């Protein structure tokens, strides 16, 4: 079973995310790409639509998209962040995310997932796992934007305001933001990002190709019973990350 190195664990602890190259085997990648082709053919985006377009699918019946997590090293790599805890797919859901050019958008800020209008409790989770399904090796080609280190800033925010502030802010906590980064990579690369890492959709105007990615919301088993505590302690569910950071400071 593959696991993150101590350096990668520390990078996740400080930046809130890691990018790992060539994780998904070619056969699994091809099968998932064909399934996305089928989705787009059966349920095409509206004519002349640009920007983001999502498909939300159940993971309960398996299939080539779910297999990107269950049948590849992605599962064990995510697991290694929270060891000895157990990782699972949250909400039994996988997201196919397209970003269709020409989309002249430039992200003005971040958000956190999980806010649901009218719901008192947010749909939080432990981490986001993204599988890049297309070339995203230049900026402004539909890349995901992230704000490094904001998992820590958000935890400090919720310590002060209380975990209910996630709902009160409607998923847009007002925190001081560093300079953003765009996620770069190619098919088969993966992103593992802390739930509280600020992120957003970017533009797709430097490329003529549709950006494709598949996302899983992952949670440590039992997360739904401790989500409030997790918002106030960014390492509560990340035992392996906490241990790696502690070793660095000795």
Model features per residue range: what roles?
Residues 118-139, 184-187, 217-220:
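Short, conserved beta-strand element in jelly-roll/cupin
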Residues 42, 50, 190-192, 196-250:
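Non-heme Fe(II)/2-oxoglutarate
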Residues 112-114, 131-135, 146-148:
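Short, structured patches in soluble enzyme cores that scaffold and shape functional sites
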Residues 137-198:
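Double-stranded beta-helix
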Residues 1-14, 21-119:
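Non-heme Fe(II)-dependent double-stranded beta-helix
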Residues 106-114, 163-177, 208-210, 229-232:
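Short, surface-exposed loop/helix-turn segments at secondary-structure junctions
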């Amino acid at each position: 079973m593959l696991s993150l190195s101590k350096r990668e664990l520390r990078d996740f602890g400080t930046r809130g995310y890691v990018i790992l190259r060539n994780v998904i085997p070619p056969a699994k990648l091809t099968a998932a790409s064909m399934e996305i082709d089928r989705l787009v053919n059966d349920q095409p985006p509206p004519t002349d639509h640009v920007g983001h377009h999502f498909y939300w699918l159940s993971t309960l019946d398996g299939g080539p998209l779910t297999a990107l997590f269950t049948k590849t090293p992605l599962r064990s790599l995510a697991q290694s962040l929270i060891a000895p805890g157990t990782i699972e797919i949250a909400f039994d859901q996988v997201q196919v995310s397209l970003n269709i050019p020409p989309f002249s958008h430039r992200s003005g800020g971040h958000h956190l997932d999980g806010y649901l209008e009218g719901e008192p409790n947010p749909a939080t989770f432990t981490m986001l796992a993204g599988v890049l399904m297309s070339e995203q090796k230049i900026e402004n080609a539909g890349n995901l934007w992230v704000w490094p280190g904001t998992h820590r800033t958000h935890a400090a925010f919720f310590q002060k305001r209380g975990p209910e502030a996630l709902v009160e802010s409607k998923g847009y906590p007002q925190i001081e933001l560093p300079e953003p980064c765009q996620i770069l990579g190619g098919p088969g690369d993966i992103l593992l990002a802390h739930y509280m890492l600020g992120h957003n959709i970017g533009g797709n105007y430097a490329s003529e190709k549709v950006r494709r990615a598949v996302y899983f919301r992952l949670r440590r088993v039992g997360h739904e019973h401790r989500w409030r505590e997790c918002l106030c302690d960014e390492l509560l569910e990340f035992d392996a990350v906490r241990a790696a950071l502690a070793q660095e400071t000795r």
